[in-house]
Regions:
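Extended amphipathic alpha-helical segments enriched in small hydrophobics
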Residues: 151-152, 231-233
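A solvent-exposed, charged loop/short amphipathic helix patch at secondary-structure junctions
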Residues: 245-265
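Conserved, well-structured interaction surfaces
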Residues: 44, 48, 52-62, 82-162, ...
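Short coil/turn linking the two alpha-helices of tandem helical-hairpin repeats
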Residues: 159-160, 166, 237-246
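Polar, glycine-rich mid-to-C-terminal structural blocks
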Residues: 237-239, 268-274
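Bacterial Sec-dependent N-terminal signal peptides
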Residues: 1-28
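Membrane-proximal, proline-rich intrinsically disordered regions
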Residues: 18-69, 253
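Amphipathic alpha-helical protein-interaction segments enriched in hydrophobic
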Residues: 220-230
Length: 274
């Protein structure tokens, strides 16, 4: 019994004297955000990731404006291809709120990604690009401008689909409380103002090219005319009868009772859109 007590005492002393940080070690080969921005090549791959969220305009499934209306009808009901196009199902009156088609809010049902995930990656890029070593300042400014335009475009696409949406200026930190995570929706005018703000910053920076000079390596990259086109589309949408004095949306208000859609027609919106 005495030997047993000695043994337990020694074991207890060994445990208490162990290095406290022995198990507090990050395993090797674990990817971190720092690794994505520790050189130009990895940062450029992250830039490409920010681009991957762009919906395909020419894709009949991903672009709701092609088949979701009643401008185009396909009469062969037994055609396998058309019966499986989610946008065509919207035109047939099958859209629903519990499991919506073309769900760019969460991703799925014809939408390859959540655009809010795209906005999160854009914010990560903007927050970390400054730390990339060996990157020419001219190229850094161009990449920043491109991702700002992507942020503006993703906000515009969500606005066009859902009306008032939350503005995602910055990412929430991982330890955010429940209250901090419940981001309220902003008004249509606020969202459009933010889109214009981002594009105006890009225009003022003069960082974007007017045309793509190297087609084989830069085809599809954002140019200055593309950025201005997004701004114009956003301003026209804000000036349109849908969001400019539309009293049918008078009950669309925030938690404080503020209207999320402009209830008084404003002619100046068309002046801004010209």
């Amino acid at each position: 019994m005495k030997n047993r007590k000695y043994f337990l005492t020694i074991m207890l002393l060994c445990i208490l004297s162990c290095e406290k940080d022995f198990l507090n070690v990050v395993p090797d080969n674990i990817a971190t955000i720092d690794l994505a921005f520790n050189n130009r090549a990895t940062a450029e791959r992250f830039l490409s990731t920010c681009y991957t969220y762009i919906p395909e305009h020419a894709h009949v499934e991903q672009n709701f404006s092609l088949l979701a209306g009643d401008e185009i009808w396909y009469y062969a009901e037994n055609d396998f291809y058309m019966n499986n196009e989610t946008s065509f199902r919207i035109a047939k009156g099958l859209q629903n709120s519990s499991s919506p088609y073309l769900n760019y809010w969460e991703g799925g049902r014809g939408a390859p990604h959540s655009l809010f995930t795209g906005l999160r990656d854009c914010n990560i890029f903007l927050e970390n690009l400054v730390s990339v070593p060996g990157l020419e300042e001219e190229e850094r400014q161009r990449w920043l401008a491109e991702v700002k335009v992507l942020k503006a475009f993703y906000h515009f696409w969500l606005l066009r689909m859902y009306g008032p949406i939350p503005i995602i200026r910055d990412n929430l930190y991982v330890g955010a409380s429940l209250e901090e995570s419940q981001v309220p929706r902003n008004s249509v005018d606020d969202v459009v103002d933010y889109i214009v703000e981002l594009i105006d910053e890009v225009i003022a920076s003069e960082a974007l090219p007017g045309i793509i000079n190297y087609i084989y390596t830069e085809q599809g990259r954002i140019t200055l005319p593309a950025a201005k086109a997004i701004k114009a589309k956003a301003l026209v949408l804000a000036a349109s009868p849908l969001f400019n004095g539309n009293t049918d949306m008078s009950e669309l208000v925030d938690a404080e009772g503020n209207s999320l859609v402009n209830q008084v027609y404003d002619e100046n919106k068309w002046v801004l859109a010209k």
